[in-house]
Curated annotation (Swiss-Prot):
GO terms for cellular component: sulfite reductase complex (NADPH). PROSITE patterns: NIR_SIR (PS00365). Siroheme binds at residue 483. The lineage of its organism: Bacteria, Pseudomonadati, Pseudomonadota, Gammaproteobacteria, Enterobacterales. It catalyses: hydrogen sulfide + 3 NADP(+) + 3 H2O = sulfite + 3 NADPH + 4 H(+). It comes from Shigella flexneri serotype 5b (strain 8401). Binds 1 siroheme per subunit. Binds 1 [4Fe-4S] cluster per subunit. Belongs to the nitrite and sulfite reductase 4Fe-4S domain family. This is Sulfite reductase [NADPH] hemoprotein beta-component.
Amino acid sequence: MSEKHPGPLVVEGKLTDAERMKLESNYLRGTIAEDLNDGLTGGFKGDNFLLIRFHGMYQQDDRDIRAERAEQKLEPRHAMLLRCRLPGGVITTKQWQAIDKFAGENTIYGSIRLTNRQTFQFHGILKKNVKPVHQMLHSVGLDALATANDMNRNVLCTSNPYESQLHAEAYEWAKKISEHLLPRTRAYAEIWLDQEKVATTDEEPILGQTYLPRKFKTTVVIPPQNDIDLHANDMNFVAIAENGKLVGFNLLVGGGLSIEHGNKKTYARTASEFGYLPLEHTLAVAEAVVTTQRDWGNRTDRKNAKTKYTLERVGVETFKAEVERRAGIKFEPSRPYEFTGRGDRIGWVKGIDDNWHLTLFIENGRILDYPGRPLKTGLLEIAKIHKGDFRITANQNLIIAGVPESEKAKIEKIAKESGLMNAVTPQRENSMACVSFPTCPLAMAEAERFLPSFIDNIDNLMVKHGVSDEHIVMRVTGCPNGCGRAMLAEVGLVGKAPGRYNLHLGGNRIGTRIPRMYKENITEPEILASLDELIGRWAKEREAGEGFGDFTVRAGIIRPVLDPARDLWD
């Protein structure tokens, strides 16, 4: 993250095919509407396969049965993933009841998947149900616009802060930023909601006709919680409060975790501090960061197109000066803040307004009725009686927010009867995985289906070494794109091949340091053997309050990553 070797502001060369597709799409319409009526295939063809991502969907198939279907000369069982736009993760109980019904009646898997980007996904939507899902969302005030592809994705906001008033203010800014950076094209409304075509020319004053060079992620974070993992994101607004009231933000730009195995031109990167801005400049600054990345981001190589690479190429100070010029402001020096953790506080927490918040641990965010644990039914029953709202956290958990004292017992009874309040270890509470197999086309190794039994084994090691009341931030991601945020964990597993992972160590508990690869392409028994030895050493040799990741660095087990653009692969 230095100013060495600043490169050109704009990368010249042959544009990627994605740029052609966006330019020719007529502001994201393509021929999606016509494709919907093609019953010969369960999928979308040509450019539409990628264009539907701008409308919040990915085309997938069930990889567990892919080979079997190929033998039967059948096409893969195509189905869509849909990701809702839900700034800050807040969803009403009426909206919850609607999504519960749709998941149960109209998806292959019948589940609601909470994600670590504070929203929910439906997996397994057949083509005939694609239009109905958008119409269902619209009927309850939701949409899936811009939750995938080259736009500003779902805006995150710290979900369970210590001060409810501060959360309310920060959440409003998350919503404002999300709305301000949305695409202006009417394609979504025309295709999915049957709204009339208006005889005006589409314009995209912020995103431009070819949108952004690559995905773009934004957060609003309230210290001391770093639950949203700001360093995984392109643009981050750190809330600065005086006397409990929000007065402005520190801006950090250029975080991101995605890498490619063996490609040393790719790297995870923590975000760079730009400085402090008063509240009234928030939207202008957000727009300036996005338009600078729009104009300077690399459109000739998608693997080098994210904001983190733009910052490294042009230099942090050059990018920052351009943001100041476009926004018409000068950043003040960053105000002090600190992070103390990023896990959710599971169980009841009292807010300052005498209401209570109940955070429920949802392993891997997968809401389904399991034998003896009817999680989905339990949450539906709570949604029917709860007067407040639900909040999805960036740790894939769910908060029943704003519960009056008089309603606590009733809600707790349902939660306990449904298995939503079963006791779990601190280690399980602080472990996370992406979806991976069977639905993700990029998956190289299991993640969500691997994690529960893997954590059983880790729990046994924690007991063996006398540290079962503590935790290590542990994450599994099925491929190096990094949706499981393993590259900000104390122990990160990155899928390499079926049953094999790269083991990364040396991140820290608060998520401000990238971990380094410790062992490559190893199996679960090999991972457990390494961690058995290292957890044993941590238990015996650590200093007071020292987290596992900090210990591995101090003990010389792993070298810290100091400047990931230059030393991640050393």
